[in-house]
Amino acid sequence: MMRKAAWPVFLFPPDSEFPLCNGEKGCLCGNFTSVRFKDGAILDFKGGMAHNAVADQACAVIRASLEQCPKADRITVTGVDGGVRIEAAGIGGHASHAEGTINAIGLIADYLLDNSLVTEEEEKFLKIVSLLCEDYQGHGLGIQCDDGIFPPLSIIGGMIRMEDGVLKQNFDSRYPTNTTGSDLVGKLSGLGARYGATVTDVEDSVPFYIGADKPEIKACLDAGNEIRGVDGKPFTMGGGTYARHFKNAISFGTEIPAEPLPDFVGKIHTFDEGIGIDRLKMSLKIYILALYRLMQIEF
């Protein structure tokens, strides 16, 4: 027999960084979906490997000649049967830390637009792709916002794919508390309609924030600071952990951003992610002390 357990009064997943994260932005994902292009110039267009990462590589195959395709920074053009292949090399990054990135999908969209290499119907859709990729804080899309608690809203285009003449460009937005997923969908849908695009496949996870003055936050924070010998402060982030699925939760360790790692150890959420034995033992001490102090609190 299956039974549904009551909500825990408090919990923490060790899925972030020390000292602790007491707030996570909302996460809105979806697609800008084009109409089915008729007699279009674009034969194929694909880029990106994940919805939550800025595309560092992209390529498109179009009906054109090499003579129509001038040289451009970060763009490589080669001849193929029936047209040309255009490849772009950008600078990737996670959706929650998009500063310094260059979106390869946007590079190709801009190249096709700047050189008039597509039909009028395709041009309309590529303009919204360009707006999405040019600015990770949503200014081009008119959705920028900042609540003073979290960093400003961010939005990126992670993947583009073409299927049966239809382009799908995904978006991944990390948004603060002074907007909502439904409000953003409304604005993006209105903008999309002007460019022949519809917003589809939407998924939304609302933001959360727990005040740093709550006793359970203080118990965890003090335990970590005492064991580490630091004066760390709570932080908020655009990433998401299991904490957002519970009524009263934070993410607590075990990553320490400034800690040097051997070359063979990958960073958080990457290949060969690892943790040093000393940090593992230190984290265990922190969690034991934090749990002991949490047990003294009357929830």
Task: Identify the function of each model-found stretch.
Residues 163, 223-297:
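Zn-dependent metallopeptidase/amidohydrolase metal-coordination segment
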Residues 2-176:
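Midchain, well-structured core segments that form catalytic/ion-binding scaffolds
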Residues 11, 199, 249-251:
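Conserved beta-strand scaffold positions in the cores of enzyme catalytic domains, especially
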Residues 87-94, 198-203, 264-271:
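A short small-residue
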Residues 162-239:
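Substrate-recognition/cap regions that form aromatic- and gly/pro-loop-enriched pockets
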Residues 43-44, 50, 57, 65-76, ...:
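Active-site-adjacent substrate-binding region
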Residues 65-75, 107-118, 187-196, 215, ...:
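Generic non-transmembrane alpha-helical segments
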